Amino acid sequence: MPRVAVLLPARDAARTVRAAAASILRQTERDLALVCVDDGSTDGTSEILVRLAERDRRVTVIRGPGQGIARALALGLDRCDADVVARMDADDVSHPRRLALQLEALEAEPALAAVGARVRLFPRRHVRGGMVRYAAWLNGLTTPGDVERDLLVESPLVHPAAAIRRTALQAAGGWREGPFPEDYDLWLRLAERGGRLTNLPPLLLDWRDSPRRLTRTDPRYALERHVALKCAFLARGPLARRREVALWGAGRTGKAFADALLARGVSVGLFVDVDRRKIGRTLRGAPVVGPGEVGRARGLPLLVAVGAPGARRLIRAELSRAGFRELRDYRCVA
């Protein structure tokens, strides 16, 4: 049995899959299996993968039904005969020591369910502001505590940079198909079961950005789908016995959270916002107050739902001055 099985789904990736697979087969950790799922390609991807398998016995090729990444991953997982399952995408490039360092981290810390790594976006001509901010935020999450604090801000691990303990993956139910991002759904379920998540400080993946990225084109990655996932997590855990919360943020994101929480029987008793046009009014039946009155939120779980660049840092500082403690009194959810 290999030390790690790398699961690589591919669909119409003939231009990039050879380099992606080569970056795995050239890892300093040689004791690996590469499980490739050709998910209904029509551009020659399958032929490229078959030739790789003919040259390297560590490569297995499976034909998928072309029904999406979650099903392809579930199909491939059945062929991953290793204690650690690592992910790889067909258009990215892993750095040579990626798997060795991730295996070392998982062996050193049994509480870790999954470990990612810092990433570098490429090619530069396609990289846009939102992805730059996301990568900078994610690259700052290099301890389990960092990830726990920011778990509900965004997906805290890059899927193709992750290595997952197989026992934790199976206990969480593996990858699920649904109207949500399958990777973030998995991270939340791993955390819900007590698994710790982190990213290694070294840069270990070149992560391709392109106008066709699913996060830009697939409705499963829309704001409302992320909010629904987060609220489901909150309702099962931190808010399981609560029927009212306070929300910092009366904009689009705050409203989305208010609606998603109400659908789960949790109402908003107070909104906090810096916009003077909103202060003094009501929203979803709750008063909107300024930051100076955040003390009115005491006794209620406070969710910070402001995604504007730089806002989270300022709000954390304001709440610290007001005596609020993160994860005990409030959580950032955007």
What are these regions (language model features)?
Residues 38-47, 89:
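A conserved acidic beta->alpha catalytic loop
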Residues 1-23:
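N-proximal low-complexity "stem/linker" segments adjacent to membrane-targeting elements
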Residues 69-77, 101-105, 109-168:
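Flexible acidic/His/Gly-enriched loops in nucleotide-sugar-dependent glycosyltransferase catalytic domains
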Residues 22-31:
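Short, acidic, metal-binding catalytic loop of nucleotide-sugar glycosyltransferases
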Residues 180-186:
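Acidic donor-binding loop at a coil-to-helix junction in glycosyltransferase catalytic cores
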Residues 152, 200, 206-334:
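Hydrophobic, well-ordered beta-alpha structural blocks that scaffold small-molecule cofactor pockets
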Residues 85:
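Short aromatic/hydrophobic "clamp" motif used to bind/position activated sugar donors
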Residues 46-79, 109:
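Conserved donor nucleotide-binding strand/loop of the catalytic core
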